[in-house]
Swiss-Prot record:
Gene3D superfamilies to which the protein is assigned, alphabetical: Ribosomal protein L22/L17
Segments passing through the bilayer: none
One biological process term in Gene Ontology: translation
Annotated GO MF terms: rRNA binding; structural constituent of ribosome
Subunit structure of this chain's protein: Part of the 50S ribosomal subunit.
The protein, known as: Large ribosomal subunit protein uL22
Similarity section: Belongs to the universal ribosomal protein uL22 family.
Any single Gene Ontology cellular-component annotation: cytosolic large ribosomal subunit
Function, in words: This protein binds specifically to 23S rRNA; its binding is stimulated by other ribosomal proteins, e.g. L4, L17, and L20. It is important during the early stages of 50S assembly. It makes multiple contacts with different domains of the 23S rRNA in the assembled 50S subunit and ribosome.
Length: 119
């Protein structure tokens, strides 16, 4: 049974967040956490927070099942564009340049590995 966590209106551009999301797509949760901890991208903190929330949601939905991070994997992760705040910057000769402050919505779905690999 899968679990989902959504982080809405994150003040980061979707393009920057998608770079970090691509790092953990399809990976086991313990490996994804290690990747995010060692990432230098600012968006990795938000992805880590949402991933931990998804793991907690999985534990909440399956109270009688005890699973570790090795048995869970990131099934899907995607970044949608959120609201865009439009600001103006004064420019020469009485003009104004438009600044678009973008935001995004991050969705992470985790699930249990069907056939876990044992070492």
């Amino acid at each position: 049974m899968e679990a989902k966590a959504i982080l809405r209106d994150t003040p980061t551009s979707p393009r920057k967040m998608r770079l970090v999301a691509g790092l953990v797509r399809g990976k086991p949760v313990d490996l994804a956490k290690a990747i995010l901890l060692n990432s230098t991208k600012a968006a990795s903190r938000n992805v880590m927070m949402t991933l931990k929330s998804a793991v907690a949601n999985y534990a909440q939905r399956n109270p009688d099942e005890r699973v570790s991070d090795q048995e869970l994997f990131v099934k899907t992760i995607f970044v949608d564009e959120g609201t865009t705040l439009k600001r103006t910057l004064p420019a020469p000769m009485g003009r104004a340049f438009r600044i678009r402050k973008r935001s995004n919505h991050l969705t992470i779905v985790i699930d249990k590995v069907k056939n876990p690999v044992t070492k």
